[in-house]
């Protein structure tokens, strides 16, 4: 079998990712990337929260698989930048075909960002609402402690907190998986943006391929939009992490107070029992 000759990539830092994607394609082993789910963000979140703690999150589908050295977003950006390189230099065998392939790759990046932004926004809204709701008892601590003297109420609090701890864990797992992908995508997009900036200073393609100016401008706009989206996701991820910690602290405080009241009630019952013996 003839060995695959991988072309030199115009961005040296993408050569490895490009070669891996080419080898996977030639071997027919290209992984099926997670597509933009037709389900709503609410459905995805409900599925995430209903799953067991150890199950993979939706975001983890993007992680590197056994035998892979490069992240899927790096490989996508390597393919996109190579396609632009072919078009600007007039060495594509079929411009229309390359443009169609590029559009498919652009759609994949857009879908990843759109889905992740939706998931982060909904997670933040959900955790903020739970945080607001659970802060109320601790803002009226004397009333809350008095209510905790009721055994059934204590049981409801403990059971509810177990569910919230599960929600915190699943949300944090999905967030961490997504942020790993976001960092990979951001790094790859930076490299692509640098390449596009360098090509802007290259006069040859502008004179020989003036029809490619629109393609260049569109891709430059894509890169700028992706960069802003990745940065926005990192900001949202940091905020989500902060409110998850706050929610966890409130749950821990409620559990602590429920435990304290429970021990107090056991002592009280024991004392009453002892007195009844005399």
Predicted regions and their residues:
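Long, low-complexity intrinsically disordered regions
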Residues: 256-278
């Amino acid at each position: 079998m003839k060995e695959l000759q991988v072309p030199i990539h115009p961005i040296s830092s993408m050569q490895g990712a490009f070669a891996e994607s080419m080898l996977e394609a030639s071997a027919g082993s290209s992984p099926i990337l997670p597509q933009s789910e037709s389900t709503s963000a609410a459905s995805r979140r409900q599925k995430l929260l209903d799953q067991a703690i150890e199950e993979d999150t939706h975001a983890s589908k993007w992680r590197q698989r056994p035998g892979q050295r490069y992240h899927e977003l790096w490989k996508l950006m390597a393919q996109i930048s190579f396609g632009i390189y072919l078009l600007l230099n007039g060495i594509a065998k079929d411009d229309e075909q390359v443009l169609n392939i590029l559009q498919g790759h652009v759609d994949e990046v857009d879908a990843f960002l759109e889905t992740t932004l939706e998931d982060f926004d909904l997670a933040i809204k959900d955790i903020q609402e739970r945080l607001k709701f659970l802060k109320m008892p601790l803002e009226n601590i004397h009333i809350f402690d008095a209510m905790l003297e009721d055994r059934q109420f204590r049981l409801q609090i403990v059971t509810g907190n177990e569910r919230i701890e599960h929600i915190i864990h699943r949300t944090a797992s999905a967030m961490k998986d997504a942020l790993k992908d976001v960092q990979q995508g951001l790094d790859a997009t930076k490299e692509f943006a640098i390449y596009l900036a360098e090509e802007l200073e290259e006069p040859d393609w502008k004179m020989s391929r003036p029809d490619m100016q629109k393609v260049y401008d569109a891709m430059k706009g894509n890169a700028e939009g992706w960069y802003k989206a990745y940065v926005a996701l990192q900001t949202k991820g940091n905020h989500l992490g902060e409110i998850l910690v706050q929610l966890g602290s409130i749950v821990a405080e409620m559990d602590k107070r429920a435990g304290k009241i429970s021990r107090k009630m056991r002592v009280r019952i024991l004392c009453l029992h002892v007195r009844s013996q005399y």
